[in-house]
Amino acid sequence: GSEIDLSAYATVGGVKSVYQWYLIDRATGKRTKATMQAVSGKDGAFIFEGKPGEYYKCEITNNNYRDWCMETPRIKVARGSADYSPADIAGLKKLAADNPNITQLKEFVDSKGWERENWNSYQDNIRTDWSTGEVGRLTHLYIWFEWNSTDTNSQLDLSAFTELRHFECENHMNISKLDVSKNTKLEHLHIYSKNLSSIDLSKCPELRYFRFGTNRTLEGRYQDTKLAALNLTGCSKLTELYLEHSPLASLDISSFKLLSRLEIEYCPNLKLQGFDKVTSLTYLALPHTEQFADLVKNLPASIRQLYLQDTEYELPSSQVGKNLESLGLPGYVESLDLAQYPNLSNLNADGSLLRYSTVKNYRQI
């Protein structure tokens, strides 16, 4: 219902400007043409309408200047304090009550931090995002603590968040169980806890991203965990899988036809089944592992990024090497012929014995 006044740009050089509104998809950034009611008798002024939580922007062009274009910032339809799902609010309050030693959670609840809808604010340690519509449902939840924090998350009840699509809580987790059976719309899960012995994701058919461990390859040794059972049955949409610091013994990935990124680190007991059935894989990282020598010898030609730091694996065949764009070298490598890697644009030699003087057919990459 607010008036958006852009009338200052209604005429440029005697030529009327054209205003085009767009609805912005928050996840993809895709724009869809939209219409705003014009204010009568005031060119370039509009009555702003939309569903709570939606984002819009207006593009202004003028034929007097062919390449001239202006855009407003993204404009968000505000939501009232009463327009959030009571069930989701109760779930956030329970999360804080279950972990009374986590001051940041308590402060978030006491201040009604969800009203900030601060998903894109990377300065905040607790961030949320909500669905569009008259009653907002919690779709994204991120909990992060400073590296030197003494807080630990000991209980994690996500059952109230039935519309949750993205959950992330990596550090200072001390949970021993995780129940996501009610989170059937979950697409992105990043979690880590040394006491978590099993994870069942079979009720999450929309899952596309799962990470158990740290955010970055070679970020450093966390404590080894108890994760010995992982059920990914039915997660056929999975595209990214990251596992580390786990005693997990076996994992069948044959049903993940869409899997494009796989990272395994510090999992000494893990054996993979069905690797040859994963035909979409382009990214493979196996640092700090010893058991995948046969796998590395038989990599698919689809691999574009390969990271083998702190391993003793053989370098890939020329058939695979010619397609590589990024390569992390095993520690023993003393020399490298770049002629075998014509498409390589990134080379990580940290921790290896490679020197500039031992690189053959050197070129700028």
Q: What feature does the model see in each segment?
A:
Residues 180, 186, 207, 227, ...:
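Intrinsically disordered, low-complexity proline-rich tandem-repeat tracts
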Residues 1-166, 184, 203-205, 236, ...:
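N-terminal capping/linker segments that flank leucine-rich repeat
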Residues 144, 168-171, 181, 190-193, ...:
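Per-repeat beta-strand-to-loop junction in leucine-rich repeat
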